[in-house]
């Protein structure tokens, strides 16, 4: 299926490894130019950039802390200067708040908000004017299953917060031919092999008894970014093996 992404530009945060790197390469295979960033792992990001360039696309790869509004603005400006546009923004950069509420402390709480909520805020504030200018855009945010399963108060708060942000944004930008959607992955393996070897690690009540494959999430991203998803907005797609039914 033709996604219509060839020649478009996808900006992806948290793109140095795991789901972020897989997403970057998935978009590159569709012919999309890339603007990718990481807050720390520049060596890994450089490797992703080289793999993407080998697929024939242009790449801007930068160190960028999404909690820093000025840094995000500079990253988006460089993307526009070098690639001319931003059509798709995928907010993958995240902070995992794993502590129980009474054990994690305020620092973990504020860090979770800064990366998982303020980060997408900065990205969207900077890319939306470019999308509005071209009257086309796709915002894709990443949530999870914690809001639905009660997986830790801090984690559940930020993951549900991004769902609310996505839905509110979807209403505000719809008149500009821009969609905003969310994906809620379950436990995702780093490879198809790991996904099939993980039956003992997944929740006992999960119908599909394995971790998800990265491509089972990136395929949803590609659909939501495609021309064919222009009538889909404000949704949260749960890709979780049935751990939670919505």
Regions found by a protein language model. Name each.
Residues 100-101, 105-113, 202:
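Substrate-binding pocket helix/loop in short-chain dehydrogenase/reductase
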Residues 129, 171-175, 230:
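Alpha-helical segment proximal to the catalytic Tyr-Lys
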Residues 42, 63-75, 106, 215-216:
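The beta1-alpha1 cofactor-binding region of Rossmann-like NAD(H)/NADP(H)-dependent oxidoreductases
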Residues 174, 179, 232-234, 240:
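Short, small/polar-rich loop/turn modules that mediate ligand/substrate recognition or access, typified
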Residues 32-47:
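Conserved glycine-rich Rossmann-like NAD(P)H-binding loop of the short-chain dehydrogenase/reductase
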Residues 16-18:
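Conserved glycine-rich cofactor-binding loop
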Residues 138-161, 166-175, 187:
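Catalytic loop of short-chain dehydrogenase/reductase
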């Amino acid at each position: 299926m033709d996604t219509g992404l060839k020649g478009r530009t996808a900006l992806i945060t948290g793109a140095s490894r795991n789901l972020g790197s897989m997403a970057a390469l998935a978009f590159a295979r569709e012919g999309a130019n890339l603007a990718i960033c990481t807050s720390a792992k520049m060596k890994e990001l450089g490797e992703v950039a080289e793999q993407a360039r080998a697929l024939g696309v242009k790449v801007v790869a930068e160190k960028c802390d999404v909690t820093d509004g000025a840094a995000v603005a500079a990253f988006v400006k460089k993307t526009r200067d070098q690639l001319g546009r931003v059509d798709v923004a995928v907010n993958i950069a995240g902070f995992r708040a794993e502590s129980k509420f009474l054990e994690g402390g305020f620092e973990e709480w504020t860090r979770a908000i800064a990366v998982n909520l303020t980060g997408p805020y900065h990205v969207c504030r900077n890319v939306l004017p470019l999308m509005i200018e071209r009257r086309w855009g796709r915002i894709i945010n990443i949530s999870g299953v914690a809001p639905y399963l009660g997986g830790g108060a801090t984690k559940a708060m930020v993951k549900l917060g991004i769902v609310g942000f996505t839905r509110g944004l979807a209403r505000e930008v719809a008149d500009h031919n821009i969609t905003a959607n969310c994906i809620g992955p379950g436990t995702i393996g780093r490879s198809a092999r790991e996904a099939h070897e993980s039956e003992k690690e997944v929740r006992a009540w999960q119908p599909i008894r394995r971790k998800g494959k990265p491509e089972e999430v990136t395929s949803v991203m590609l659909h939501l970014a495609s021309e064919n998803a222009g009538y889909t907005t404000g949704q949260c797609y749960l890709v979780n093996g049935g751990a939670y039914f919505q």
